[in-house]
Design a protein with these regions (language model features):
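Conserved beta-strand position immediately N-terminal to the Walker
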Residues: 24-26, 162, 388
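RecA-like P-loop NTPase motor core
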Residues: 333-336, 341-450, 455
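Activity-critical C-terminal alpha-helical subdomain
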Residues: 454-538
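Charge-patterned, long linear interaction tracts outside catalytic cores
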Residues: 226-230, 241-244, 249-256, 400-405, ...
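Glycine-rich phosphate-binding loops of NTPases
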Residues: 53-61, 78-198, 267-268, 471-472
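Extended helical coiled-coil dimerization/tether regions that scaffold
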Residues: 183-281, 285-296
């Protein structure tokens, strides 16, 4: 089973959204873009026991408009198709849309797939001040006339949908994930075993009440109360010790898994093993239980407590085990277990409450494949950023990063990260052409993209590259003609500061400086400095970090301008410094 489409109206932060996954889903996005809301919306359609609906679940608290969440399910299997034969419709996998009039079998294309549509309607009752919730079949329902064909509770149980709860793993309670994966015969056997455990505890509690260290104190206590209790029964018949209420549900609440991991300390409660082990067990449980029914598994904030290797490995296993997995994450290494088209990124629009959906895609050209190499190295680590500042190469990125740190130390100017901006570069080869490719990919994933580049001396070539950049990015910021990053970070610096910083850098790194370089001044000194900064794979950041006084004027101006454009402070599409 897998979800082919999810349409949301007026639910939490979504006024209107249409999500069309391509197989499994890796859900990423900037803060407050709706990752958790989207997964919660899926859960509402498949809830067996409906959870509470309140005013805050309605878009902007407007309870006059109904919540509508519609899900289209494919890859149903024979059992679901036969059980819900009257509700079947057909889906065009190429157009990724429902085929209208699909009851006419002669009009159905040969590659069409059978689907079911289920929907959730949330309506606010002003009289009782509560939310009224209905899950219904879309095919033969008419919400406008309030004619809804409800999906019965037992029918909702037929759908293999698991939303991984935030509670403890290996939970034997009826709503626990482990318990839900049991077959009918296994569930009956577990019930018998739990009853035997409870009876055994009852027997042991009776023996405890008869134990010599206890009986005396209990008898003395009960003797004080006998006139009020009006009983002459022996003390063990009056007092027993039972775990948490004495009921089976209370017993299950008191039970928690304990693990012996072979480290010599024996069995320890899972909570004592730390957050990483807890998260590993939770994910392993989800993988094991989803294998039985090719389920749709939904996990929010996946891998927040996992180490890097476990995050990547468990994400890959979960993807292989499930019919379809929806993972929401902030961890970039999780993406290594997914295909690029399975990436969905949510962003916030400019208007309050506006949200957008963006999709990863398969690179089809050589230029796109080259840019895709930076997906895992730079773009996915920036997945939670609102904007990216694309520079030509690693030297540019290092220089601007160091400059931002120094400015915050000196005058409190906030760095790009404080505004939700990440600096990324064109990779090892770098260059304006690669920056344009990277900008195009970033923009397709919903980032606001600003590029900060050099101005080539060849005017015709500069014009051609500028046009490519403007087509790929939201804003292009260009340094003065003929100025590269090395010249920008030396701009307006006193000769004494340049000599001091080069001397400090040279104390750690072997710089190719000419004999007597300390006596150089003006342009001669700057040419020597630029040659030295390009050595040792670039020492731009180290130079900026050791500057004793003022910072370079042009580099600061360029960074300020680019950050302002990332924030949308400047509406212009091109800035020539």
């Amino acid at each position: 089973m897998n979800i082919l489409r999810c349409r949301i109206e007026n639910y939490r932060g979504f006024e209107n959204a249409d999500v069309l996954p391509r197989g499994h889903v890796l859900l990423v996005g900037e803060p407050r873009s709706g990752r958790s809301d989207l997964l919660a919306a899926l859960g509402k359609v498949f809830e067996v026991d409906l959870t509470r609906l309140d005013e805050r679940d309605f878009f902007r608290g407007d309870t006059s408009r109904d919540i509508c969440i519609e899900v289209t399910l494919g890859d149903l299997g024979v059992e679901l198709e036969q059980r819900f034969l009257d509700e079947l419709e057909f889906w065009d996998p190429d157009a990724r849309s429902l085929i209208p009039g699909s009851d006419e079998l002669g009009d159905i294309p040969p590659d069409a797939v059978a689907v079911l549509r289920l929907a959730f309607r949330g309506r606010w009752d002003d009289v009782d001040e509560r939310g009224d919730q209905t899950i219904y079949w879309t095919k033969r329902s008419d919400p406008a006339s309030d004619n809804l064909r409800r999906v019965r509770r037992e029918d909702r149980q037929a759908f293999a949908f698991h939303r991984l709860p935030g509670g403890r793993p290996l939970n034997l309670a009826p709503r626990g994930l482990l318990r839900s994966a049991l077959s009918e015969s296994e569930a009956e056997a577990l019930t018998v075993a739990l009853e035997e455990m409870r009876n055994g505890i009852d027997r042991l509690s009776g023996e405890l009440a008869l134990a010599l260290p206890v009986i005396g104190a209990l008898a003395a206590t009960i003797d004080v109360l006998r006139p009020y209790l009006e009983t002459d029964a022996p003390t063990p018949d009056v007092v027993r010790f039972l775990p948490d209420e004495g009921s089976l549900s209370g017993l299950l609440r008191a039970l928690s898994p304990a693990l012996d991991l072979g480290d010599g300390v024996g069995f320890l409660p899972l909570s004592r093993h730390g957050s990483t082990t807890h998260a590993q067990i939770s994910m392993a449980e989800a993988i094991a239980t989803s294998r039985h029914d090719h389920a749709v598994v939904v996990v929010d904030d996946f891998a927040d407590s996992l180490d890097t290797a476990s995050a990547q490995r468990l994400a890959s296993l979960l993807r292989r085990a499930c019919g379809q997995v929806w993972l929401s994450t902030r961890r970039p290494e999780v993406a290594r277990g997914f295909e690029q088209p399975e990436l969905i990124r949510l962003t916030r629009g400019n208007a309050p409450g506006q949200r957008h959906v963006h999709y990863g895609s398969i690179p089809t050209t050589r230029a796109q494949r080259v840019a895709a190499r930076e997906l895992h190295r730079q773009i996915l680590p920036a997945m939670t950023a609102r904007a990216v500042l694309v520079v030509e190469g690693p030297h540019d990125a290092a220089a601007h990063g160091a400059l931002a740190e120094r400015r915050e130390e000196i005058d409190g100017t906030l760095p790009p990260e404080a505004h939700g901006i990440r600096i990324i570069d064109g990779g090892g080869q770098g260059g304006i052409d690669q920056a344009a490719r990277l900008a195009e990919m970033s923009r397709s994933l919903g980032f606001r993209v600003v590029t900060l580049v050099d101005y080539d001396r060849d005017e015709a070539e500069a014009a051609s590259r500028l046009a490519a950049l403007q087509a790929a990015a939201d804003v292009v910021v260009r340094l003065p003609r003929g100025m590269a990053i090395e010249a920008a970070i030396l701009d307006d610096l006193p000769d004494a500061d340049v000599i001091s910083a080069l001397g400090d850098v040279g104390a750690t790194y072997l710089l190719p400086l000419s004999a007597g370089w300390e006596t150089l001044t003006g342009n001669d000194l700057r040419r020597e400095a630029m040659r030295a900064l390009k050595s040792n794979n670039g020492l731009h950041a180290q130079f900026i970090q050791t500057l004793p006084g003022m910072l370079p004027t042009m580099a600061c101006s360029a960074l300020d301008t680019a950050v302002g454009c990332c924030r949308g402070v400047s509406a212009t599409a091109f800035v020539q410094l």
